[in-house]
Amino acid sequence: MTRTLLEMSNLQQVARNERIQLAPMIEEIFTDLAPLSDKLGVTLTAEGDGIMTGSDALIYRLIFNLTENAVKYNRPGGSVWVRVTQKTEKLLICVSDTGYGIPEEYRRSIFQPFFRVDKSRSREYGGVGLGLSLVWEITNLHGGCVRVEESSDKGTTIAVELPTGAETEPSGADIS
């Protein structure tokens, strides 16, 4: 928890001017998450690619956190897809799973620090409820937006839209 809080407190100071190609980064994330996905029998699939300017370390953390959550809170034998769509000035990253879904009333709250939809399942997998808050902060710092695109008892898709251009100002989006 301390490490995550330190990461969050230092986000403003991180340079966001690196050229990032997402497909190789996603493959690295899948390799890092293979022990967990193998243990839970969750299949990981990547589709698409894109190039953007930002912080390599922060974009890695953003996609890692979304993908890790999709694996952790999935059904045994489920699937996770990470899809990247490159548009002219925007990049769309969608992480979808075949999990249990996020109730409508919690879809904005999940991006707040320390929030947990299901505290009993969260204890099983560890963490303190900062992963999606960090995703929101990183997205904001890159001038983008993050949202629950869809969610039902058949799974969830979280979409992140980021500008592809050079270092941007934080979007100032509000999650309250």
What are the residue ranges of the model-derived segments?
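Acidic ATP/Mg2+-coordinating residue in the GHKL
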Residues: 97
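Conserved glycine-rich
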Residues: 143-144
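Short conserved segment of the HATPase_c
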Residues: 102-116
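Short beta-strand/loop element within the Bergerat-fold HATPase_c
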Residues: 77-89
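A conserved beta-strand-to-alpha-helix junction within the catalytic ATP-binding
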Residues: 18-34
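Short conserved segments within the C-terminal catalytic ATPase subdomain
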Residues: 36-46
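Short helix-loop "hinge" at the ATP-lid/N-box region of the Bergerat-fold HATPase_c
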Residues: 70-71
